[in-house]
């Protein structure tokens, strides 16, 4: 289970690369395109915010908040919108929007710079080791 969570957290492209053992790039690209089309159409079918998330976001209203996901930015925004959460965030950064994906600290640094926040004044909340590793960078 932990291996599955780690693979999924690395993003769609890495997931497809690990599943499709064929080194043929067109095959991988076709599988990725088909998966993205399906995934995009069913983003929120089985996804719900963790209990207490909405109340917590409401309580943190005056603070700047961001989402950093290894998911493509367009899909991240679409999912947040479908879940009614987009309104809580000042910025959403996807795995295709920074020079590196989590666990790289690059997306965290980009968000802090964009929002004008010094690293020692920021808090990271995540649901995987990748989030913690990115925050420590």
What is the predicted function of each stretch?
Residues 5-7, 65, 122:
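Short glycine- and Lys/Arg-enriched binding-loop motifs that mark or flank ligand-binding interfaces
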Residues 8, 67-68, 126-127:
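Small/polar loops that bind or transfer phosphate-bearing groups
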Residues 54-61, 132-136:
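Surface-exposed amphipathic alpha-helices with a cationic face
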